[in-house]
A protein has these predicted regions:
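An amphipathic, aromatic/His-enriched active-site/gating alpha helix that lines ligand/cofactor pockets
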Residues: 54-86
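Short S/T/G/P-rich N-terminal loop/turn motif that feeds into the first structured element of a domain
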Residues: 1-31, 35-37, 41-47, 85-107
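Short beta-strand-to-loop capping motifs
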Residues: 4-6, 51-56
């Protein structure tokens, strides 16, 4: 998932020429072997919106974000790794097997 915030100039362009940014995002993702699941806007929040997408790898997701940022229409951006419920359950099971390395009390 990527959270994004547009520059003031990007907003001005979108107001003057409303356009489907989901299609543009999907085009970029498909170039890298990914796909857009959804593009959502969050007016009034820290970020203007977020894109939920799939990419072949974490490195590819980073490449998509770098390519998007380089276009100059984003003021800020944050890439987040989203886990499914199944992935989270597997992570919890792995964590349960971790050794206890907590500091020990004197005594």
């Amino acid at each position: 998932m990527a959270q994004f915030a547009y520059t003031p100039q990007a907003w001005a362009t979108l107001i003057q020429t409303p356009q489907d940014r989901a299609a543009a995002s999907d085009t970029l993702l498909r170039h890298f072997g990914g796909r857009l699941i959804g593009l959502y806007y969050t007016p009034g929040a820290e970020y203007d919106g977020f894109a939920l997408f799939e990419a072949p790898s974490d490195a590819t997701a980073a490449a998509v974000e770098i390519a998007d940022i380089a276009l100059g229409h984003l003021r800020s951006n944050r890439l987040l790794r989203v886990l499914s419920a199944e992935e989270m359950r597997a992570a919890l099971q792995q964590a349960a097997a971790a050794p206890n390395i907590a500091p020990k009390a004197a005594g």
